[in-house]
Amino acid sequence: MMTTLTARPEAITFDPQQSALIVVDMQNAYATPGGYLDLAGFDVSTTRPVIANIQTAVTAARAAGMLIIWFQNGWDEQYVEAGGPGSPNFHKSNALKTMRKQPQLQGKLLAKGSWDYQLVDELVPQPGDIVLPKPRYSGFFNTPLDSILRSRGIRHLVFTGIATNVCVESTLRDGFFLEYFGVVLEDATHQAGPEFAQKAALFNIETFFGWVSDVETFCDALSPTSFARIA
């Protein structure tokens, strides 16, 4: 059953049962003091409301029959998956750079199995959800995301998570190039860097690549009364 989500720059209509809510990298690394972003000098002090808003969005999406996909960014303990000096990721990843500056952190930042890699305690995948590791910013790079979505007839993606201006935007952009309709819930995301990075990412998304809405509006669009209005 179709519903219409109020968004910028215009409303978008979609079928929740042929859509997915994507939770990007809600790991201790990105959302918890003592995690990678915090240790690398980024401000994570305002991530708690984002976690709560994602909980709300996930609950509403699951009740409406949407597929929930959780991403975890990171690599093996030896960081082979991160790429060596021949990879730009080796030079640009702030996690890798932080570990080179502070060798005592080696094997602790974004390493699979570590506390840093784990999802925050408040966000727990449920049976029927899909949890995917990813080795780069985009959730489409070297993951089965595209085939998972296409095999289910899913064309609409609703994004939450951290960081808006890095992994969220990268995944939404790649989805745009693959003909997916991407919506980001702005109050269920958080930037890496100053506030202007959040504003710039949202501007790019709503102007060039997708749509921007918020959690309350999203939940309202998934309510039974909204489906009744469309019908």
Curated annotation (Swiss-Prot):
Name of the top EC class for this enzyme: hydrolase
Organism from which the protein derives: Escherichia coli O9:H4 (strain HS)
Source lineage: Bacteria, Pseudomonadati, Pseudomonadota, Gammaproteobacteria, Enterobacterales
Protein family according to the UniProt entry: Belongs to the isochorismatase family. RutB subfamily.
Gene Ontology BP, a term: uracil catabolic process
Record's keyword terms, sorted: Hydrolase
SUPFAM superfamilies documented for this protein: Isochorismatase-like hydrolases
Protein name as it appears in the record: Ureidoacrylate amidohydrolase RutB
PANTHER family: ISOCHORISMATASE-LIKE DOMAIN-CONTAINING PROTEIN (PTHR43540:SF6), PEROXYUREIDOACRYLATE/UREIDOACRYLATE AMIDOHYDROLASE-RELATED (PTHR43540)
Function: Hydrolyzes ureidoacrylate to form aminoacrylate and carbamate. The carbamate hydrolyzes spontaneously, thereby releasing one of the nitrogen atoms of the pyrimidine ring as ammonia and one of its carbon atoms as CO2.
